[in-house]
């Protein structure tokens, strides 16, 4: 039985652990998040911050692992930079792309520049500082978004409608998050897409999932609180072309907006690791964690049958969406549809009692760290 260690936790860790456990793998996790540490899907847990890489390497030395999978951007970067050394010294394979590809997507400014240079559809974007406000406004216009180059969960993203707004906001964003960009505002607060793909070393897209995020928190632009798996071949092709130009090998998770005026798609970012909404793939028939293991160890891939139309709710923040959205009683799917054969939860697993209460605390934490 292969031993697989997850570097990090969160809801993505919970989903990955469930998927791996369902096909018989031994799952180890290093995280300080209790929601995963107490999960019935985890065989062995080390309670440690995800950034304690020295302790992680000590785990590999004393408790040999066959494969390491990152649950966060920082963990993905660390494993990508050190994958050759880790394999040589500890015998552990790191399920991450090579760093030459990885470094192009970790920084949002670098990735947007790459997209614009390679005719990949994306919003107009320019690096922003207190010294080039005039040039940035001329290039991008208003309304626009100030976006930190490195952040997660929509943190720090601020909409500005004029120069006064920009001047009032930029100082705080720079001091809190560091370097940032000014990006064209895509006017669509109703939904966005999340596209998950796996590209193997032969350049083949082995599997994909597209989810449409129809409720989010914060309400206008945030993490998914309700999404639906869909079929969208055009989106898959756009994202696959992007991965080809990046020479990407491995799993990738795209955020994509669609303009309301001309219906054009615009790639916003790539997350170089599995997302918190990964369970949307699992309930739709695609086991990405199993697929990753199979590809890494040259195990013949299974034929997955994708079944769209599955609804995944993140109840902890869907409650916050309900409290703040004016569409609480008109939303589709209905906010009050708690049960059904196609309704699942990102934070509650029927087969893991440890999640039956912890979902509430995770949702509250999301509220207070915004």
Question: At which residue positions do the language-model features occur?
Answer:
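ATP-binding N-terminal substructure of ATP-dependent carboxylate-amine bond-forming enzymes
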Residues: 1-97, 359, 368-369
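A short glycine-rich, hydrophobically flanked beta-strand micro-motif that places a catalytic Asp/Glu
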Residues: 249-261
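Short acidic-hydrophobic, aromatic-tinged amphipathic segments that line or gate anion-handling sites
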Residues: 45-51, 126-129, 158-161
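Soluble, non-transmembrane catalytic domains of enzymes that act on hydrophobic metabolites at membranes
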Residues: 260-262, 268-317, 321
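Conserved ATP-binding module of the ATP-grasp superfamily
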Residues: 121-123, 143-145, 156-189, 218-221, ...
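A conserved helix-loop-beta module that forms one wall/lid of the active-site cleft
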Residues: 88-156
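Peripheral (often C-terminal) accessory segments that flank ATP-dependent C-N-forming ligase machineries
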Residues: 134-136, 294-370
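ATP-dependent carboxylate/phosphate-activation module, predominantly the ATP-grasp catalytic core
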Residues: 164, 172-173, 184-247, 271-296
